């Protein structure tokens, strides 16, 4: 079964890298996440302009904002228990910051935090640049998993599928494979790895589960929890 959802139209992303980050949360610890601080830190570290976005919305259009500053001032709405999705886009450059909370089950016992970065400041070609970015990322939060790739023309970063252009809008199809993958990402702490990308931040369990030939790629010990695996 395939579903369609509407997306922002923007300039084609050229020479941009994307990084997706994941953190496993629980209902009892969800309130510990400061969404405002997360947004502020990511914008400061990975976007050159202090106000890099012209399309900002929360919870799929529940409210729109004219700037990051106005978003951060809305502290009540930024509660991690009230936020399910934040989307920030630069319609000219194609740069993006997307934050999503995926709640598993009606009781919301398990929550997966996903952050998507698309920025011209992400240089994942050089080893030194990749390690620097990895260190910056772990200074923001204790991630459980992350990966990065270059955005090809016509690719929707969220679903990693091709964008369909219609007469007056654009859309992407959400496949059953994508839906199943998002469910399995709740098991990253148990070693689940969807696939290897040019840039990977893996936890210890994931390192144990990757194919043996992957051990030939460049590996770097990042901290007590994570490794960087480069497959360029």
Q: Across the structure, where does each feature detected by a protein language model lie?
A:
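C-terminal interaction module
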Residues: 1-54, 156-232
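Internal, hydrophobic cores of structured domains that mediate oligomerization or house catalytic pockets
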Residues: 49-162
């Amino acid at each position: 079964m395939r579903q369609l959802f509407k997306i922002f139209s923007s300039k084609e992303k050229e020479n941009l890298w994307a990084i997706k980050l994941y953190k496993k949360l629980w209902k009892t610890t969800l309130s510990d996440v400061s969404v405002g601080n997360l947004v502020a830190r990511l914008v400061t570290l990975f976007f050159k302009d202090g106000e890099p976005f012209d399309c900002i919305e929360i919870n799929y259009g529940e409210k729109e904002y004219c700037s990051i500053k106005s978003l951060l001032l809305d502290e009540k709405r930024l509660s991690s228990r009230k936020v399910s999705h934040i989307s920030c886009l630069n319609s000219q450059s194609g740069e993006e910051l997307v934050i999503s909370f995926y709640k598993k089950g009606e009781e919301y016992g398990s929550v997966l935090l996903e952050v998507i970065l698309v920025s011209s400041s992400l240089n994942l070609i050089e080893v030194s640049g990749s390690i620097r970015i990895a260190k910056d990322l772990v200074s923001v939060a204790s991630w459980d998993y992350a990966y990065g790739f270059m955005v090809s023309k016509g690719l929707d970063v969220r679903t990693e599928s091709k964008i369909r252009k219609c007469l007056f809008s654009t859309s992407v199809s959400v496949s059953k494979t994508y839906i199943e993958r998002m469910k399995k990402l709740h098991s990253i702490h148990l070693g689940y790895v969807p696939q290897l990308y040019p840039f990977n931040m893996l936890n210890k369990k994931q390192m144990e589960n990757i194919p043996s030939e992957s051990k030939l790629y460049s590996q770097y010990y990042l901290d007590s929890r994570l490794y960087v695996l480069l497959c360029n």
